[in-house]
Amino acid sequence: MEELHAEHQYLSQVKHILNCGNFKHDRTGVGTLSVFGMQSRYSLEKDFPLLTTKRVFWRGVVEELLWFIRGSTDSKELAASGVHIWDANGSRSYLDKLGLFDREEGDLGPVYGFQWRHFGAEYQGLKHNYGGEGVDQLKQIINTIHTNPTDRRMLMCAWNVLDVPKMALPPCHVLSQFYVCDGKLSCQLYQRSADMGLGVPFNIASYSLLTCMIAHVTDLVPGEFIHTLGDAHVYVNHVDALTEQLTRTPRPFPTLKFARKVASIDDFKANDIILENYNPYPSIKMPMAV
């Protein structure tokens, strides 16, 4: 019996939300169909779970993840690499709408990268040198994999209650846990808020890539990515686009390799990360709710 393509998990989740989701008003004013609590699992051993039923912005996945790893909170730094997915949240008008009038344009506050690399440090703007401040959760996980791989405390948390009011956008993907078994590294992500149309395909790829990168620098092989969703939702203005996507049959996933041996997570460059045999359907335009 032929094994079902892993992408069908995502498509089935979308279909279930469209058929059974509860209509909810939301902070963006767009409105969503929503289901609470979903999970999917993607093997990272032979191929890489970049969805094929629409083209996913792979370069954006890579550049954003490297930006997180650098601990950056500057949307203009990401934009300089040609990736503009955070521009709206760092705009002057958006920051003013949040009451962050003194915040420099592009300064997103203590968002993902800051929490990953400087958890607990006092946020003092994007130009401050945070070297040695706070807890470097990412480095701590890598060190623990080396020294105590059976540890059950390999967690990286982006949700810092004290810092949430200072963030242009509180984290949607809030908690990841890493797990080593039989020489394989796996990751489970808890995502409190899951935009099925735009965010989730990106998040699957991003945390799968992070898992592969950490496995590479710790001399393990990638195992599995498990994606647990809290509020899984479809924006009402994405319904038609996702209905079209559901008509498409998944194609084989691409494969991932690294161009060289990289010793430290901080040493990865975009051209070290090579995606091969990605043959998706055309992209489907969906507006971003801000």
UniProtKB/Swiss-Prot annotation:
| Biological processes, Gene Ontology terms | dTMP biosynthetic process; dTTP biosynthetic process; methylation
- Gene3D superfamilies on file: Thymidylate synthase/dCMP hydroxymethylase domain
For the ligand (dUMP), the binding residues are 27, 152-153, 192-195, 203, 233-235
Q: Which reaction does it catalyse?
A: dUMP + (6R)-5,10-methylene-5,6,7,8-tetrahydrofolate = 7,8-dihydrofolate + dTMP
Q: Which InterPro entries does the record match to this protein?
A: Thymidate_synth/dCMP_Mease, Thymidate_synth/dCMP_Mease_dom, Thymidate_synth/dCMP_Mease_sf, Thymidylate_synthase, Thymidylate_synthase_AS
Record's keyword terms, sorted: Methyltransferase, Nucleotide biosynthesis, Transferase
Question: What does the subunit comment say?
Answer: Homodimer.
The family note in this entry says: Belongs to the thymidylate synthase family.
Task: Please identify the protein, giving its name as recorded.
Answer: Thymidylate synthase
* Species this chain originates from: Herpesvirus ateles
